[in-house]
Each structure stands twice: as C-alpha cells, then as structure tokens.
C-alpha cells in the first residue's frame, strides 16, 4: 500500500487535542501506510504523545501554531484574519501537495470559505457541496447533499451535486450504478419549484447517471436510492432533524429497557443485538462530511465528536484519498457533459 499523508487540524472541535490526538493514534495503528501532519499548539499536543512507541511517532509530524478559528467566527473574518490558524495551515498542506487530504472538526463556514479559496473548485463545478451518509433500512448508507454549504441553488448546481454524489458513492461504496434522486415535496413530475424541476430535466438527459426521479422526505431512509440531492437549506434541516430523532429513539429505547425486572433481564440476554441496533442509529457512527467539488480532499468532523466518531471521519478521508476522489469527479463530469452536448 502506498503511503498516504493526512493533514489534521488538531485544534478544531469542542475538545481539540484531547479527542483529535488519541483518535489519530488509533488511526495510525489501524492504517500502517498512514502518515499524519498535526497542525496546532505544540504545548497541548506533545504531552499526549510522550509515551508513544517510536514506530508510530516516526509517522507523525507537528506544525506549530497557537491560532485557532473560533466556532463563532464568521467565514469572511476567518478567511481574512486567521492566516496562521490550524485550520488554514492544514488546508494549505493539501494545496501544496504535502498531504492528500485534510480533516477538521472546526467552524464549518470557515472551512468551506478557506477551502474554496485555497483549493479552488474542479473544472465544471460552480460550488463545492457538503455531503454525508445516513443509515437506511437495508443497512447500506444513503448519501445526502448539500448539507448547508449552499442554502440556495440553481438547477445547474443541483445537477452538479448529483454528479458529485454519484461519483462519491461509486468511490466509497464501490457501487457501480448508484440511484440518484432529487428531494422534493412529491414524486410527481409536476411537483416542486422551478430549480428542482429543471434539475430533474437535466438529469433525465444524462444517460451515465442512474436517475430515479423525485423522492419525498418519508422515503429518505428506505434504501430505495443511494444519493439524494437538495439545496443546503433543506439538507441541513433534514440532517439535523434526523440526528435529533435518532438520539431521541436511542434515549427512549435505553430508558424503556431499564423499567421492570423482566425487561432488564431480557435486555441483558439480547444485549449484543440491542447494541448493534443502537450503533446503527447513533449519528456518531456516520461522522464525517465531505466537502466535495474541490481540487483537494477536505473532510469535516462533528465538533462534538468523541474518539470513535473522529476515527470514523479519519477513515473517510483515507478512503477518499485512496480512491483519488477529486480526479474521479472531474473525469466523470467531463464525460457526462460531453454526452449531453453531443
């Protein structure tokens, strides 16, 4: 396996190095080919590496900075005034080809703005999109984009999102023909606003895409499609609502299994199965949103992620780097546009 270098914003997220460093060490043990460049405050990072075995330590490089993009910083402020922040320096490592991917749990808006300026979008892509996967009833993930990077989108942008989401599903899940759908207020062709209607027409003209038409909100988790496309306003609300409902269900299930002697006894007997179900419903199991459409790989972790969830985001970044996702998107979009124009 060819060595792969990942740039990490070690200071990002609610917990900074207390989570990012231990999770990174787990990743280094999991992926023998992985090297990491941790960007952040050396005084906070080095104590967490003091007892590390030499073979792992040799695969870690530190880039020192004390500047951090705050969660309350506006994207424009972060772009103009945080030139030495851990987030920006990590993205610069991807731009300068010193790392194949970047991961941050920091400010999403700032990550989007800095990444777009430093890395630029791929040819034929107007705007990058934020995409993540959700669980479905058939145990395979469904990819949803955009998740908030673009609150308003024209039909052409939605079409580009569909192409990028399809390629991502092909690359990560090795699905040769992902089914792509547009999230809408109904499945009938006459439903939806002009942007969604026109995007549907563009997708119907693209034989290389496995377009499945419109999909409603109650069908998101059915597993009937693999990629669901919408603007960032709808996508962000959908994602946050899904996470809230999932946490409610997990809470209610755990509470219900502690009420009564026989229920507690039954819960102990079927604990492995219960834990499996809870893990499938836990949003942390799907941590890691990809900022796709750029000339480099950028993955966003939840700011509140624990070690396990942050490791999940690292694994996603590794997979995308191995598959050379930006190159795949660029080549596929070029081929699709040639088909349409001919």
From Swiss-Prot:
Localization annotation: Cytoplasm
Reactions performed catalytically: a fatty acyl-[ACP] + phosphate = an acyl phosphate + holo-[ACP]
Any one GO biological process: fatty acid biosynthetic process
Enzyme class, broadest EC rank: transferase
Recorded metabolic or biological pathway in which this protein acts: Lipid metabolism; phospholipid metabolism
Tagged with keyword Protein transport: no
Gene3D superfamilies: Isopropylmalate Dehydrogenase (3.40.718.10)
GO cellular component: cytoplasm
Superkingdom classification of source: Bacteria
Keyword terms of this UniProt record: Cytoplasm, Lipid biosynthesis, Lipid metabolism, Phospholipid biosynthesis, Phospholipid metabolism, Transferase
Keyword match Plastid: no
Pfam families, per database record: FA_synthesis
Any GO molecular function: phosphate:acyl-[acyl carrier protein] acyltransferase activity
Enzyme Commission number(s): 2.3.1.274
InterPro entries: FA_synthesis, Phospholipid_synth_PlsX-like
Family statement: Belongs to the PlsX family.
Record's function text: Catalyzes the reversible formation of acyl-phosphate (acyl-PO(4)) from acyl-[acyl-carrier-protein] (acyl-ACP). This enzyme utilizes acyl-ACP as fatty acyl donor, but not acyl-CoA.
Oligomer status and interactors: Homodimer. Probably interacts with PlsY.
This protein's name: Phosphate acyltransferase
């Amino acid at each position: 396996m060819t060595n792969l270098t990942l740039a990490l914003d070690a200071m990002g997220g609610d917990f900074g190095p207390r989570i990012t460093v231990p999770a990174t060490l787990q990743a280094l043990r999991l992926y023998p080919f992985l090297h990491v460049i941790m960007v952040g405050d050396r005084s906070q990072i080095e104590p967490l590496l003091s007892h590390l075995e030499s073979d792992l330590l040799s695969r870690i490089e530190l880039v020192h900075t004390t500047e951090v993009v705050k969660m309350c910083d506006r994207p424009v402020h972060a772009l103009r005034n945080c030139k030495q922040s851990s987030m920006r320096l990590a993205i610069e490592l991807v731009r300068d080809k010193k790392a194949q991917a970047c991961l941050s749990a920091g400010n999403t808006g700032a990550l989007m703005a800095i990444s777009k300026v430093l890395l630029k979008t791929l040819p034929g892509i107007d705007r990058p999109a934020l995409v993540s996967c959700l669980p479905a009833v058939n145990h395979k993930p469904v990819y949803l984009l955009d998740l908030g990077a673009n609150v308003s989108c024209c039909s052409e942008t939605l079409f580009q999102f569909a192409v990028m989401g399809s390629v991502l599903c092909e690359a990560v899940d090795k699905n040769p023909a992902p089914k792509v759908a547009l999230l809408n207020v109904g499945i009938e062709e006459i439903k939806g606003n002009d942007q969604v209607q026109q995007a549907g027409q563009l997708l119907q003209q693209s034989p290389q895409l496995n377009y499945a038409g419109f999909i409603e909100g109650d069908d998101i988790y059915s597993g009937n499609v693999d990629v669901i496309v919408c603007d960032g306003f709808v996508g962000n609300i959908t994602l946050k609502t899904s996470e809230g409902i999932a946490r409610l269900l997990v809470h209610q299930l755990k509470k219900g299994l502690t009420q009564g002697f026989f229920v507690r006894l039954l819960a102990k007997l079927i604990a492995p199965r219960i834990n499996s179900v809870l893990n499938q419903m836990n949003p942390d199991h799907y941590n890691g949103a990809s900022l796709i459409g750029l000339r480099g790989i950028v993955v966003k972790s939840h700011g509140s992620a624990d070690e396990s969830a942050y490791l999940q985001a690292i694994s996603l970044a590794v997979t995308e780097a191995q598959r050379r996702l930006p190159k795949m998107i660029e080549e596929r979009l070029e081929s699709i546009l040639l088909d349409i124009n001919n």
